[in-house]
Structures are given as structure tokens and as C-alpha cells.
Design a protein with these regions (language model features):
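Short alpha-helical segments used as structural interaction elements across diverse proteins
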Residues: 1-4, 23, 63, 76, ...
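Short, well-ordered beta-strand segments in beta-rich or mixed alpha/beta enzyme
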Residues: 2-9, 39-66
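Non-catalytic surface loops within mature trypsin-like serine protease
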Residues: 10-12, 58, 92-95
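Short amphipathic alpha-helical segments
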Residues: 12-37, 70-75
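Intrinsically disordered, low-complexity acidic/polar segments
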Residues: 15-17, 49, 61, 97
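Short conserved AdoMet
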Residues: 30-33, 57, 83
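Glycine-rich beta-strand-turn "strand-cap" elements at beta-sheet edges
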Residues: 39-46, 76-98
Length: 98
């Protein structure tokens, strides 16, 4: 299992469009084979910055998602709303405390 973090900066007047679309597709993303967890965060100081935080079984699962029709549809819509190039990291969890 690993964590995928994606940072996105949106045009301020496009934030609501992004949130509406995310609401419509979030369960499809979460239920994609290999996805264990999905969260969306908004920066406290800059409302144009959002992060997705997702857990994936393995890199193959993430690649299957990234090559899926679902991803293509979501990403094509979402990237038109950006005000800056997105950034993404695949990371291994080292320590987790609850």
C-alpha cells in the first residue's frame, strides 16, 4: 500500500465547478479497484489550493486508474480549471499514529 498526494491550484472562479464535479465522481474514484481511501483537502490560507490524498494497493492499481476512462474524463475536466501545473507524489507511509 502507498499514498498518492496531488496538489492542485484552481482559478478562483472555477473552484465551485471543481467541487461540484468532485462530488459527482468521488465515489467512482474511491470504488475503483485498488483504491482503499480518498480525501480532499483545501488549504487554510489559500482557498485556490486543494490536495487529494489517496491510498492505493500498489503502483499497478494506480496506473490502471490513470489509464482508465474514468480518470481521463475526470482529469480532462479538472485540468481545464487549473491556474498552475499540478504536482503529485507517491509516498510510502513510514509512521502512523491514531
Amino acid at each position: 500500500m502507498f499514498v498518492r498526494i496531488v496538489k492542485m491550484r484552481f482559478q478562483e472562479d472555477k473552484i465551485n465547478l471543481f467541487l461540484e464535479n468532485f462530488e459527482a465522481v468521488k465515489h467512482h474514484i474511491r470504488n475503483f479497484e485498488g483504491n482503499q481511501f480518498l480525501e480532499l483537502y483545501q488549504d487554510k490560507n489559500d482557498k485556490c489550493i486543494f490536495f487529494t490524498y489517496s491510498f492505493w494497493d500498489n503502483e499497478e492499481s494506480l496506473e490502471n486508474y490513470r489509464n482508465s476512462d474514468l480518470f481521463k474524463e475526470v482529469w480532462d475536466y479538472t485540468k481545464a480549471l487549473f491556474s498552475a501545473k499540478p504536482e503529485a507524489w507517491s509516498v510510502d507511509k513510514v509512521v502512523s499514529l491514531a
